[in-house]
Amino acid sequence: GSEMCIRDRLNGKVSAAINRKLSRNFRQNGVEITPEQWTVLLFLWEKDGVTQQELCNATFKDKPSMTRLIDNMERQHLVVRIADKRDRRTNLIHLTKTGRELEGKARFIANKTLKEALQGLTLEELKVSQDVLRKVFTNIKD
């Protein structure tokens, strides 16, 4: 009952606070991306030239949200849509030079932000909390 509600709010608050901090740290260091764009870039730095559907699956976003996100990232010259050679109807999302060059700085800032967020926690505490969140996710994912 109310316990679940408190936990939901806490988790929501925690991730919202981390995202705000990440946004601020990006901005203050001249990296003009949102936390949502960060998750897309993170995936593309590992595996470039993927379908929009792959990005949806990786980031748990729906099609319309992802379309908007990619549109904005295209306007910022971070990514470009290129028709798939095997299937002209499908666009593959590729990093631009700008998108690739952002990686070092953005990862550095994100790691710094994470360190700030996790300061004072022991490795054991982190491990337990990850295990707990993994179990919760496993319980509720479709």
Regions from the language model: what does each represent?
Residues G1-C5:
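Short, small-residue-biased leader/transition segments that mark boundaries at the very start
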Residues D71-D131:
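Charged, amphipathic alpha-helical coiled-coil/dimerization segments
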Residues V14, I18-K21, N25, T59, ...:
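Alpha-helical linker/hinge and terminal dimerization helices associated
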Residues R7-D8, T96:
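Short alpha-helical transmembrane interface motifs in multi-pass membrane proteins
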Residues L42-F43, N57, G104, Q130, ...:
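A cross-family signal for key residues in well-ordered alpha-helices
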Residues A16, R20-S65:
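N-terminal helix-turn-helix DNA-binding core of bacterial DNA-binding proteins
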